[in-house]
Structures are given as structure tokens and as C-alpha cells.
């Protein structure tokens, strides 16, 4: 049976050309009034998926 891509993971994680996994940072969706602007600025942009989670994420994406 073919391995299916986990769609929830596919919507959240992008694979770069070199094969690295990128994700958005958490804590920047709502309730931003109480958070300092320095914190929301720091949470801007994307970051790499941690090395501990890399193998699992690639398996969910069907890239393993």
C-alpha cells in the first residue's frame, strides 16, 4: 500500500531545495495585545524544524 502524506503536517512544514524543513513560529496568531512587540518581532518569519523532530516529519511528509 502506498504511504500517504500527512496533510496537517504538509500544510505547516515546507521542504527547502536542499532538503531542510522550515516551519512558522508559534505564539503569533492571536492574543497579541498582551505580548511585548519585541517578542512578536522575534517570532516573525520561519525557523528550522529541530533535529530531534526531523526524521518523524520527513516520514509524515513522505520524504523519508
Swiss-Prot record:
Pfam family, one: Ribosomal_L35p
GO biological process, one term: translation
GO molecular function, one term: structural constituent of ribosome
Keywords, comma-separated and alphabetical: Ribonucleoprotein, Ribosomal protein
Region Disordered: start-end pairs: 1-20
Record-stated family: Belongs to the bacterial ribosomal protein bL35 family.
Protein name per its UniProtKB record: Large ribosomal subunit protein bL35
Source organism per UniProt: Corynebacterium urealyticum (strain ATCC 43042 / DSM 7109)
Lineage of origin: Bacteria, Bacillati, Actinomycetota, Actinomycetes, Mycobacteriales
Amino acid at each position: 500500500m502506498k504511504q500517504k502524506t500527512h496533510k496537517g503536517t504538509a500544510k505547516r512544514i515546507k521542504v527547502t531545495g536542499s532538503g531542510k524543513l522550515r516551519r512558522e513560529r508559534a505564539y503569533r496568531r492571536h492574543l497579541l495585545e498582551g505580548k511585548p512587540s519585541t517578542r512578536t518581532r522575534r517570532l516573525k518569519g520561519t525557523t528550522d524544524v529541530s533535529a530531534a523532530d526531523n526524521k518523524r516529519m520527513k516520514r509524515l511528509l513522505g520524504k523519508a
